[in-house]
Amino acid sequence: QAQVFRELHPVYIELDHVFRQTNSEFIELLNQVRNNSLTAQALAVLNKRYIPDFEPTRQADNYITLSTHNSKVDAINRREMEALKAKSYTYHATIKNTFPESMFPMDQVLTLKVGARVMFIKNDSSQEKLYYNGKLGVVTALSKTTITVTCEDDMVVEVHSETWENIRYTSDTGADTIASEVIGTFTHYPLRLAWAITIHKAQGLTF
């Protein structure tokens, strides 16, 4: 309804190929949910998955707790970390120039132990493309300068630091162009604890 849409007449493109799922029945169910056209049959399929008295077995299975509140997620992750007997290692972000705390993509301080369940929070910027945002794994080796994660597909990844950029955009109305300038960076290992995550962080992930 914005005026800019009426003036620009944008071209709308619908993405209609699903890459993350291959089960046609599941894809159809997801489409019904997306289009608010859920049938009684599809609802019955979903309800079969509901187990009201379910209790995950501690450390035995790769269950992830989803919560609407960061405080609950942090409490669960802290509790699970404390239960691990391994030595803890702490890693600090490197922040250069202008990068306000409100823009931090993750905590400035990352503490890990061998056995910690983690999630990558950025796509691998190297040519190998070993991980992507949302990929899950377990920390299998740590040192002061290295982090090794074994992912759910058994791929072993030596994690390197990634850099997020704070980009300032300026427009040149005379030339009808937009210029970009990197005014700050945030560099850290792109991992977060993942025994529990917020529903917001889980959006778009496949478990």
Segments the model singles out, each with a brief description of its role:
Residues 1-207:
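Conserved ATP-binding/catalytic motifs of P-loop helicase motor domains
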